[in-house]
Amino acid sequence: SSVALLGLGNEGHWGIAHLCCLWAGFYITTHEHLVHGRITFPSGFSNPTEGLVLVVATFLVLSVSPRCLEATVVDGVSVMGSAPVSLRAKHCLVLSEAATVLLTLVKNVWKMAMHKGYLRPNMSLAKAISYLLPLATVVIMAHGLLLERGPHRLTFVGLAACANLSILMLIICEMTKSKFPAVYVSLSFVPGALAVWVLGDAALLPFAVLGLLRLAGRWLNFQRELVHYCGMDGPMAVQRWPEKHPNKQRLKDKIPWL
């Protein structure tokens, strides 16, 4: 994520927009798998694999030509009498990602609302839409902090920690077919954002550090439960199923920490 901030020029908000778009595409497609059971990838950057490839490609290109994303693509073009518009490569990159995310979100919500039987059994439309709450929360936080405090590396790190914590929780719930605590996850981000909003730069470091600690704790907890779920001797053990398939009784075990 820091590659995007450092590589998208002096305007750090484009780096944060780059992060939000890539993460939102990953979140929306994982959300679709949780509420529907399948993932349908449109063309663009909604595929998580494509998003990761894009991050790596950005890193490689910027390592060779750090200023390449500052190149002018459109210079002073007026559309239908509007004010002249100038676009750089970084603007085109982020805007194309944002368009893909928006179209994917509209498509998924349309299918949930209009196609009977699209949602999993016991999954209501209201519940499915509520699972998008962390996505909206992080985007609103990013917008508010950028307007109030401007781009800053620690703001970027804190937002990235919130984004990755919510996507990790969503993935865990998708794997275990558990209820996603969307409201709890969203509300847990608010105190840090409010602290930065009120206290300013003094709260940026705690906001970033606490976010990373929460993410690390959840990740380690996830690894511990994954070891039990797979029947492994330990986190470094080679996986061997006791039968030719996973232990069916173990698959029915509840994971209490969720």
Which functions belong to the PLM regions below?
Residues 1-24:
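Multi-pass membrane catalytic core of lipid/isoprenoid biosynthesis enzymes
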Residues 23-258:
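C-terminal membrane-associated helical module and adjoining short loops/tails
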